[in-house]
Amino acid sequence: MQADNVQTLLSAVLTNQQTCLDGLQSTSSAGSVGNDLSVPLSNDTKLYSVSLAFFTRGWVSKKKRGITWKPKSKHFAFSHGRLSMKMSARTRAIYESVSIRKLLQAENNDIEISDIVTVQQDGQGNFTTINDAVAAAPNNTDGSNGYFMIYVTAGIYEEYVSIAKNKKYLMMVGDGINQTVITGNRSVADGWTTFNSATFTVVAPNFVAVNMTFRNTAGAVKHQAVAVRSGADLSTFYSCSFEGYQDTLYTHSLRQFYRECDIYGTVDFYIWQCCSCPPKL
């Protein structure tokens, strides 16, 4: 395992443990459990913190410490608003039939697509809900055959989407910002924790979202109300918008990349915990 990966995982352990403790403390029925665990968890936090410090000092190259990553567009094959893709003849026929005009191909640096399904509310696609399409995606793929692509046609999708860690190498493409919209209204004021209030949650590694809007309409008076919570390692959000009021975008942990995205909110609308998020917003 590369040093960068170990460093990332140690950092994520600290974040996830603190989130677990916060969750216990916010649950009234688990108050005694939280108190019993607070000291052991505090000791564990110190252990992981020291381990991370030693590892960073001993194994991570000095040249990489404190340097902001500057990705080149060729890494993502974005050129003049286009995303180049490589796919089989069958998959390409489906792809072209649904007319994703803004994402037609270039010849080099193709992103390989293993299969494609469409979500269309009028029933003319493969699925009418995003959750059903996510459920149909293969589990625990290694990416060698490319991404499983979900094309979500224009519409307002009132559903809470959760992409589990076994749905690796999933790509979700919409018709554009404010065209393909996933919306919800969970909030802390209505009894949800900040962590569980998200309209869209993803923890699957190598997730990609393009041309989507993620929205939480709870309102400013409802306090924390997350539109997107991401704990997906090596995930990418390109040309997406995140709309809410408080804690709109919750970048929880691990490595994430955002490019040409819009984030809307009124207070603390971007929240992060020990994650690496090279942005180009």
Say what each PLM segment does.
Residues 152, 172, 207-209, 235-238, ...:
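All-beta strand scaffolds that present successive hydrophobic residues in beta-strands
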Residues 1-83, 103:
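Extracellular/luminal ectodomains of secreted and membrane glycoproteins with large N-terminal domains
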Residues 177, 214, 219, 237, ...:
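Beta-rich extracellular carbohydrate-active architectures
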Residues 73-135:
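Right-handed parallel beta-helix/beta-solenoid
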